UniProtKB/Swiss-Prot annotation:
This is Acetyl-coenzyme A carboxylase carboxyl transferase subunit beta. A zinc finger (C4-type) spans 136-158. Its EC number is 2.1.3.15. It comes from Cuscuta gronovii (Common dodder). InterPro entries: AcCoA_carboxyl_beta, Acetyl_CoA_COase_Trfase_b_su, ClpP/crotonase-like_dom_sf, COA_CT_N. Keywords: ATP-binding, Fatty acid biosynthesis, Fatty acid metabolism, Lipid biosynthesis, Lipid metabolism, Metal-binding, Nucleotide-binding, Plastid, Transferase, Zinc, Zinc-finger.
Length: 491
């Protein structure tokens, strides 16, 4: 703007300024016709003419240095050079400001339309079409599943990683046609009987038998130590009047004590039930409370949940193990699947991984395990925790005694007992960008320590700086990086 002013007005211009209507069919504003854009004409000494057009309705400014159309004379004779500079400067500033505002409005409108389109797509697509798409958790853009699989489960919009199934991981790493699964028919039979109803019924029967035996033992001891009259007298003193109607004789009540008869399944709510019935104890009450809680609990029994995830994922448990070739090199591979009960480690998972390690040990194969787990499986109790020690012991023999090569690959998320055992025991530990790795999640830590942990503190990039991993490898480079590591170790 300053250069234009210097070139236009400080070089001794001869100003001949006009306002007029342009075009062949232009109409003079004073004639009452349609108004066309107004123009300011400036001509220098050499005769070169510059025209500036002003469209008041659309706020458009144009500068035409080749304009030669004759215009009507200026209507205001008081118009000076200074006024021209000031007004021109003002108009240009206003138009620049309007342009910035319009760009911001256009940007906001574009974002709004984008959101509306996503919402429209979501509303229009019925349920039987939605399974064809996966929505990115980072940018919320839907990705077509077939394209997503060919793109290694990487979002086309923002490049963030989707969770991969165990089968997709195997296809990514193992050469086509070389995969041979191991122990694929091994299933869990609820070894801890976490939700066993038969065990609960047996426990109730034991409590009833125990109560009956205690009652009989009490009566035998009472009859042995005291004479019949003393027993009746002491018993009558123990019983309050509301419990002993006047028409019932004490002798009849004693006989009733010695012959308790409760129908199976009958609840004790009558105040006239005898003492042996009231002494069922806290354990029996806890069982009744647990039954009530189980009825109110929405979670299905463990056996039913296993059946559901088997049908949902097509897997028998949360890990696939086997042998195959990686760029022509034989390897033993174990891949956990987070879809099956959050990839939790139970007896089957621990046994399959242990057998895989033993197979690799006996056949002198390099071992690769990809972890994706929520930790030990609480449904199997201490048996699931024992898998940590069992796998670690097998790895000790594999690494220390046989001096073989174990690569641990951590995928998102890897937490709990898996992180505390074989996931962090690799000779080389690799992870993907943005992987969530922790022993306990932010919610658990906050409840225990009353401290809030930022999410990025438990991601791969932050943990890599603290020495948790050896490599952070993008997904599309993972196979070649593993192949190079195997070459370096002469395996």
């Amino acid at each position: 703007m300053q250069n234009w002013i210097d070139n236009s007005f400080q070089a001794e211009f001869e100003q001949e300024s006009y306002f007029g209507s342009l075009g062949e069919n232009s109409t003079n504003p004073s004639s009452g016709g349609d108004r066309y854009p107004e123009a300011l004409i400036i001509r220098d000494i050499t005769g070169k003419t510059s025209a500036i057009y002003f469209d008041i309705t659309d706020d458009i400014l144009e500068n035409d240095p080749h304009q030669t159309i004759l215009l009507s004379p200026i209507e205001n004779d008081i118009w000076t050079e200074k006024d021209v500079i000031i007004d021109t400067y003002r108009y240009i500033n206003e138009l620049i400001f309007c342009d910035e505002k319009s760009q911001q409005k256009q940007k906001d409108r574009t974002e709004f339309i984008k959101k509306e389109q996503l919402q429209l797509i979501s509303n229009r697509n019925p349920d039987h079409y939605r399974n064809l798409w996966n929505q990115c958790e980072n940018c919320f853009i839907p990705n077509y599943k077939k394209v997503l699989k060919s793109n290694m489960q990487i979002c086309e919009e923002c490049g963030s990683y989707f969770k991969m199934t165990s089968s997709d991981r195997i296809d990514l790493l193992i050469d086509e046609g070389t995969w041979n699964p191991l122990d694929q028919d091994m299933v869990s039979l609820d070894s801890s009987e976490f939700d066993s109803e038969a065990e609960l019924e047996c426990y109730e029967d034991n409590i009833k038998e125990w109560n009956e035996e205690m009652c009989q033992a009490f009566m035998r001891k009472l009859s042995k130590d005291l004479k019949e009259g003393q027993a009746l007298e002491r018993t009558a003193n123990l019983i309050e009047e509301p419990w002993l109607p006047e028409y019932i004789q004490p002798e009849e009540k004693v006989e009733e004590w010695t012959k308790p008869d409760l129908d199976e399944g009958e609840e004790s709510q009558d105040e006239e039930r005898w003492i042996w019935e009231l002494d069922k104890g806290e354990e029996s009450q806890e069982i009744e409370d647990s039954e009530a809680n189980d009825e109110d609990d929405d979670d299905a029994p463990y056996v039913e949940r296993l059946a559901f995830y088997k049908k949902e994922t097509g897997l028998l448990d949360a890990v696939q193990t086997g042998v195959g070739q990686l760029n022509g090199r034989p390897v033993a591979l174990g891949v956990m699947d987070f879809r099956f009960l959050a990839g939790s480690m139970g007896c089957v998972v621990g046994e399959k991984i242990t057998r895989l390690i033993e197979y690799a040990t006996n056949n002198l194969l390099p071992l690769i395990i990809l972890s994706a787990s929520g930790g030990a499986r609480v449904h199997e109790g201490s048996l699931s925790l024992m898998q940590m020690a069992k796998i670690s012991a097998a790895l000790y023999d594999y690494q220390s005694n046989k001096r073989l090569f174990y690569i641990s690959i951590l995928t998102s998320p890897t937490t709990g007992g898996v992180t505390a055992s074989f996931a962090m025991l690799g000779d080389i530990i690799i992870t993907e960008p943005g992987t969530f790795v922790a022993f306990a999640g932010p919610r658990v830590v906050q409840q225990i320590l009353n401290e809030t942990i930022p999410e990025e503190e438990q991601e791969a990039e932050a943990l890599f700086e603290k020495g948790f991993f050896d490599l952070i490898v993008p997904r599309h480079l993972l196979k070649n990086v593993i192949s190079e590591l195997l070459n370096l170790h002469a395996l």
